[in-house]
Amino acid sequence: MGSKIVEKKRKSRDSDSESDNELGDGLFDGVLSQSEDEEDYIPSSEVDEDDDDDADESASEDSDDSNDSEDDEVEEDDEALLSDEIPSEGESEKDQDLAESKESKQDQDKEPSEPEILEPFVDPPRKEDEELEDRNYRIEKDANGGIRYVYDEIDPVYDSDDTDYNVPVNTIGNIPLSFYDSYPHIGYDINGKKIMRPATGDALQNLLDSIEVPEGWTGLTDPNTGKPLNLSRDELELIRKVQQGLIPDDVEDPYPDTVEWFTSVEEKMPLSAAPEPKRRFIPSKNEAKQIMKLVRAIREGRILPYKPPEEREREELEKEEEFYDLWQNEEPQPPNPMHIPAPKLPPPGYDLSYNPPPEYLPTKEEREEWEKMDPEDREKDYLPTKYDSLRKVPAWGNFVKERFERCMDLYLAPRVRKNRLNIDPNSLLPKLPSPDELKPFPTVQQTIFRGHEGRVRSVAIDPTGVALATGGDDGTVRVWELLTGRQVWSVKLNGDEAVNTVRWRPTKDTFILAAAAGEDIFLMIPTHPSVTPALDQASRDILNAGFGHATNGKQQANLPPGKEPPGKWARPGTRLEDEGVLLRITVRSTIKAISWHRRGDHFATVSPSGQRSSVAIHTLSKHLTQIPFRKLNGLAQTASFHPLRPLFFVATQRSIRCYDLQKLELVKIVQPGAKWISSFDVHPGGDNLVVGSYDKRLLWHDLDLSNRPYKTMRFHTEAIRAVRFHKGGLPLFADASDDGSLQIFHGKVPNDQLENPTIVPVKMLKGHKVVNKLGVLDIDWHPREPWCVSAGADGTARLWM
């Protein structure tokens, strides 16, 4: 026994030295999370102590049993079998092994054996001691004095199915160990015995333990037992395999043998080498019978071996015509929750009946008129027809066309499901003041001015507010008394050209009217009861002052040779001079608009058909005509001077450009967003602009805010021809449209720039008739009163008060 103890101690020392070498690299970070329960590890010192105790017990038992005979041992075994404790199957097998070992011992005692060489002072080993060491149970006495077999605890291996193996030794459960700080023990084992707190060494002992690292040392403490937490050899081997990228499980073979499921040897010889049977070389009797049937049918004419040429051609044509089924491979699809059914066709009316009422049948004139119309302009694609009976109704000729158009509509027009909101429409409208609170503004028609033949293209009220000038397609300019509607003066300027525009000079010290007919601009002094001799003489002096000015000669001298001047200033002729027309200016293209400067010495004309000379500025005191633009982007539509500053606005089809006449530079480009601008007007304050367009929109621009429209209004169903602000200080402006109506607006511009303008539509005036899709062509305001005058395509001008 002493030799065994010495050997065990040597082995423990050798293992300590090996553990030092294995843990020399110290690569164990995070390995504890993969290790098994700490309670399964038993220190080597405890194993040695258990072995020593077992050795001492076995030695004492051997000494006691040596005095008994073999018969006594047999009797003891019989008594053990007759005791209360019945051994299990494993125990009975072990008893049989003991009996067989005893029989073998008796046989060996009978046979002569060689003498064993024994060490001096050492007792010879006894076979009974070896057998007792191999037993896994011990014999104890129970409470009745009988024999009781107590087996050692089973140590399950890794592959065991014992689920209680991983249960920790400390059975206190999920309770913090801090509850046991005041007790000498730290819990209870499975048998209910206290687990005493292990002794802790001092700092020096801890330092020595950290230097002399045992095998499996981790430096951690098991919280359940309070003992050092070390790793076993199997856990160290598992860590090594994980670090080296090997398979941790020893059961699985990383390199299994290849299983050849199919042979790789090519078999060239047949599986059967029997000769071919004779029946394969003899014609078939059954096939011969079938062939003879076909031969008889051909002889009798029941089967034609060759088809007739007509039938073959017909079959070839049928083969060339290939028909495809569009829905052959169509797969059924589940119903889509977002599916929107197609709208249903409207039900047929009385006019689609085969026997409609007589009032639905068209007359001969209506039929001819319907046939002459274009298909796009027809209200219906068919004419009602009467038949005597339903069987006489022919097939519908436009059926395929109608179905095709419906399919195209369904295909090209996507259907959208609109979610309707339960919102009061009145809550979405801005809160505007009542129109009754915004009076005065024109509400009724006061006077109708008749006399022109054809359309009245332009109207203008003089600065004093007593005379009204109109120009029309008949080439005449007429002057009326505003309140009475009486015509007081008329002159025919041109028999071939219409008078496109008339405008008064904006000063009260003169009574000068400018009118444009074709390529000529006429400046005249009409006869009116309000014109005094002094006012008439002052007007003539202003018109005649430019004839003797030297600037006209310089203008002619500065022109290159062979080039005509942009404007020719001359007398209109004796006939027109006698009627009051004193001056004529001829330009290169037809004039559509005239705009005066606020001081009355300059006015601008616009000729949309002219390229470079579309915009011209004329100086009345010098008889000078100038072309300010060498190149203009787009076709000019109209122009206007700023009411307060030296700014000049020019409107093209899509934009309005603002130029500084002093600095001669472009200041701003206003983008209304309209397709075609028809007219515009500048607010008397100079910071706002209103634009009318042929696409039925009226746009308000705040020049200080942005170059985009501040507000867009759509109140007309046709194009807007003219817009005009009230120049007398009233917050009113109006527009004229081809639908025959005028829309009056209240547009208040506050002095505080932080406030937005207030725009309220207050009245729609209707009175003009629409002729050839033309309605109201021009509009002008009274200089002081809330009155306006409109010119219409019906040949009348109307005063609204």
UniProtKB/Swiss-Prot annotation:
Changing residue 486 to A: Weakens, but does not disrupt the interaction with YTM1. Keywords: Coiled coil, Nucleus, Repeat, Ribosome biogenesis, rRNA processing, WD repeat. InterPro entries: BOP1/Erb1, BOP1_N_dom, WD40/YVTN_repeat-like_dom_sf, WD40_repeat_CS, WD40_repeat_dom_sf, WD40_rpt. WD repeats lie at residues 451-490, 494-534, 586-628, 631-669, 672-711, 715-755, 771-801. Its main location: nucleus. It is found in: Nucleus, Nucleolus; Nucleus, Nucleoplasm. It comes from the Eukaryota. Pfam families: BOP1NT, WD40. Residues 35-90 have a biased composition (Acidic residues). GO terms for cellular component: nucleoplasm; PeBoW complex; preribosome, large subunit precursor. Component of the NOP7 complex, which is required for maturation of the 25S and 5.8S ribosomal RNAs and formation of the 60S ribosome. This is Ribosome biogenesis protein ERB1. The gene is ERB1.
